[in-house]
Amino acid sequence: MNIKLRFPRSSLAIAILSVVAFLVLIALTAFFLVHFYSEYLWYDQLGFTGVIVTQWAAIFVVFCLAFVFVSIFLWLCMFSAHKFRPRYTSLSSVLSHYQKVIDPIRKIVVLLVSLGLGAVAGIFAASRWDIVLAWLNKVPTGKSDPIFHNDISFYFFDLPFYRRLLFFLLVTFVLGGILSILISVVYGALRVDGKEIWLSKGARVQYAVLAAGIFVLLGLEFWLNRFDTLLSDRSGLITGAAYVEVNALIPGFAVLALVALGVALLFCITAFTSRWRLPIIGVALAVVSALVVITALPWGVQRFHVDPNARVLESEYIKRNIESTRFAYGIDKTHEVLYSAKTDVKPGQLRNDARTTASIRILDPGLVSRAFGQLQQFRQYYTFGDDLSVDRYHLGGETRDAVVALRELSLSGLGSGNTWVNQALVYTHGYGLVAAYGNDRTPDGEPKFFESGIPTTGLLGKYEPRIYFGRKSPPYSIVGAPSGAAPFEFDYPSSSGGESYTTFKGSGGPKLDSFLKRLIYAMKFGSEQILLSSQVGDYSQILYDRDPIKRVGKVAPWLRLDRNPYPSVVDGRIVWIVDGYTTSDQFPYSDLNSFTTLSQDSQSLPALVNGSDSINYIRNSVKATVDAYSGQVKLYAWDPNDPILKVWEKVFPGTLHPIKEISGDLMSHVRYPLELFNIQRQILARYHVTDPGVFFSHEDAWGIPIDPQKSEPVMQSTGQRRSRTVFSVAQPPYYLTMRMPGQNLAAYSIYSVFIPKSTGENSRSVLTGYLSANSDAGNIPGQISPDYGKLTLLRLSKDQTVPGPGQIQNAFDSDPKVGNQLNILRQGGQTRVLPGNLLTLPVGGGFLYVQPVYVQSTGSTSYTLLQKVLAAFGNKIAFESTLNQALDSLFAGNSGASNSGTSDISIHPPPHSDLIAQIKAALREKVDALTNKDLVKYAQADSKLNELLSRYLDANRG
């Protein structure tokens, strides 16, 4: 007997939709569980559980408050609109039809609409949990604004919170009004009959109360607008309240606030009198008042009173802007020195600057990456960054500038061996720091390394060389092995066809000590192998989120991070040093700018900032370190007096370490942040002027010279309010150990130059100023050098004409002798000539320019070699094989400088130097064969090179 079950089509559709909805619900639940649990495990392992729990708690509480308030408010609006409907009234056929359709499901629709809009409101409110926490934990700054005399903390913490709260309430009231009108129309409480509008009594009361609430909120909005004038750039002249704002807009906004409150009162009266004429007149009056106060009055005052006397009337407000901007950007204590620069040359002119000239960095970190790769990569699964870092080390009794890089892991180099086992379990880390003298080279033009090789040898002593956490680390690795088991993580190549293995020891990531955790991470990374692999067990740890910037950003979400972390060997370990900034766009009278635009130079990484990119206050409040082996993150309160830092210390107690815990070794590697210096030099280009009259006329505005090596604009994205593209070719600043004029000792500092800000035919690339920031924090544990961070500005006399970087580069490019030698270096197109960084140095009573010149063959495996040095002083230039020769050529055969470009440190000769020579020869044979497209010789040279490298590694290992 066959029994056939038949389901109505509607029931089948409901069943299918129910199953789909259930599956979607399960998937969403699983997604959130995986995300939240894995995040908790990550923070817990690092010891920052309080950070994520506080975030989640704040998000949850803010969401719930907003959700409950909006849901109840909107439900009450719709419920009241229905409750106050007329009981007996004739409706049109259309409205009657709508009532019949809606009535059966009215309650559920009202509930769903209320809950849905409440959820949206909750998400909106919770997205800025940071504003709420900052407001709840605010601290005074001790500094007040010049108009209202409010503490600056009011603008940092109170005003953003009040602004967002008002916007939230205003939108809620407007939504409540719209929904109430819809219900009233459907149920006849609001009818339009020809020219007449009819309202039921209940609807009249409800609309009047809602309108009164809206105008109360608008009144508060106008009142807050008074304070916003101190933060706006409406005048087009400065950020902050200028003459028109102080004398017209601020009083006008106060009047508008009173008008709005008066209109609200009229609506309240209407709720009881049913007379709409007065509130309608009030609304019209409010609109006219707003047009007059916001548009007509400021225009009239500006046009007929300010413009004819602008220089005098705006002087007071320009002065406030100058003082506030210089303080907010940390340039108010810049030490200015009038520098009378010489342009003539004479023998022995650099004798008093011998220490500086001996330290001139001729190694360009932006050009030697390929040389580091070809000479120190050793295997295809290692890599170096494109732009290397500049650091300094104490070697042989003195501090030497160095170009450094980490030999990081590159999974793309595995080729066909790029399996899951190799990706996740075997190739887990890079190996070793490579460092070369900044002021030296080999006779062949290669970097002169003082720390290199595998295993690492050199002058830095013994340290942990393995790099599990870096800029190029794999998305995730699983490390660890059972006690006594043979290690299976690849460590480094050790012999011909052989490899050395290791096992990670320590705590670097969440433990996979349960089936649930392995399931969670299998789902997170979309890899079932995490569950199935026999090499993953209770002993395993999973390492992920390994980029030092990302790690610091997660444990300190309130920080803005510098995009230029750099590695250093500190206390026997490799650590990444990351600079963190506290910023705000709420400092009264301070110039408002885009962080991304100000911090860009021709070598900056592209940055797309989510949310507001605006700033008018910045402090380098935190120095962070990330251990390259364990991934441990430490945050140090570098500027404990910063009020924003104090707030976040209250929000996340116990996450910041005091300065006293910084070791002497770490202190010696701390430097002045690159992006902060970029921002400050851009601000100082305009705000070196402190006289309001000169500032108003723009007669002494400066600019940053373009990078002479960049012929094409570098396109970058900004995130200020709306994403846009900017073009940045600003010459990058440079780190160097040098003695500035007027100083007794040389100091590791960062430098940049200024030229006049002009465009078109009137542009002049002559020097107007030279800026330095002391980057030497000293080496005393827990104590910052008093000179660290000191800004020094050499201001040139206006009657002097000293060539700027652009003019010097043009002189280099157009000099016939230099051109002839460059043509020889190009070898008929077989090699490329690459100019290095153009350094400007205030020595010899003037300015010395130095530029290394590199050559690179056209082969794919070629790398840059430093072959020549260009130098210039005044209008004289030299082009020689060494810096010393170039300086002597400039200064009539005797510069008086020491042996620049050579090292007097006793360096242990590399073991088996004959092998090194053979390796270099084989490498050149390989490059030449590839250039000539001789595949047979290329294969032979490659085989020979691998054999020699294996012998060298064996010799070092032994």
UniProtKB/Swiss-Prot annotation:
It is found in: Cell membrane. The keyword rRNA-binding does not apply. Keywords: Cell membrane, Membrane, Transmembrane, Transmembrane helix. Coiled coil: none annotated. The keyword Kinase does not apply. Signal peptide: none annotated. Its main location: membrane. It is a multi-pass membrane protein. GO terms for cellular component: extracellular region; plasma membrane. The chain crosses the membrane at residues 14-34, 59-79, 107-127, 166-186, 205-225, 249-269, 280-300. Belongs to the UPF0182 family. PANTHER family: UPF0182 PROTEIN SLL1060 (PTHR39344:SF1). This is UPF0182 protein TW644. The lineage of its organism: Bacteria, Bacillati, Actinomycetota, Actinomycetes, Micrococcales.
